Regions:
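Proline-anchored loop/turn motifs at beta-strand termini and strand-loop-strand connectors
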Residues: 1, 97, 101-127, 138-140
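Short, solvent-exposed loop/turn segments enriched in Ser/Thr/Gly
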Residues: 14-15, 27-31, 86-90, 131, ...
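Beta-strand elements of well-folded, non-transmembrane domains
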Residues: 36-40, 51, 94-98, 109-111, ...
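Short beta-strand segments of immunoglobulin-like
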Residues: 76-83, 122
Length: 183
């Protein structure tokens, strides 16, 4: 949805295209123009791309067509609190959305924090496969807040997005890609 494209600040959603405000979901993310010619008259119909499948209970189901990155990441913790100097583990789950995803995962962190290991190699041969990787986080001596951002590199491409799917029977499926991070 258009209101989730930008990071929310101060309890408000930031919307770059103000003309969309008030719309339920906003325009379809992927649509095509179909050109027809009938008895010498030409016309064009714009239609959204949809993924159609059959469910034994619901019958025909139409989901919005979504283009996903090759890899998405999710963190086991949205927020980590360090009451002392003891290190904590942070687990990152990688999900491959294409075959043959091989690369390395690192964790961006504030300057005076330490993370071990510096990076972890991964190899995910099939789309849909997942890898659970773990980092140990060492906080600084002085209390400080910061962000831990997982960063997967495959060749010269970098991936930092987390996938959230919202699916209920009474609304269309909503797919949200947001920055993967731990506070």
């Amino acid at each position: 949805p258009y209101w989730l494209k930008n990071q929310a600040t101060s309890g408000r959603f930031e919307v770059s295209n103000r003309a969309l405000i008030g719309a339920a979901l906003g325009p379809e993310s992927v649509s095509v123009n179909l050109d027809f010619s009938l008895e010498g008259h030409e016309f064009t119909v714009k239609t959204p791309l949809r993924y159609k499948y059959r469910d034994r209970v619901q019958g025909e189901v139409f989901d919005p067509f979504v283009v996903l990155p090759a890899l998405t990441l999710s963190s086991s913790e949205a927020v980590m609190v360090f009451n002392d100097q003891k290190p904590k583990s942070l687990n990152i789950t990688l999900t491959a959305h294409r075959d043959a995803q091989k690369g390395s995962l690192s964790l961006q962190h504030p300057e005076n924090w330490r993370v071990k290991p510096k990076y972890i190699d991964f190899d995910m041969p099939k789309a849909g496969s997942q890898a659970n990787l773990s980092f140990t986080i060492y906080p600084p001596k002085e209390m400080q807040s910061g962000q831990l951002i997982p960063l997967a590199q495959i060749g010269d491409q970098f991936y930092t997005k987390s996938l959230l799917e919202i699916q209920y029977p009474h609304i269309p499926k909503i797919t949200v890609l947001e920055q993967a991070q731990t506070q």
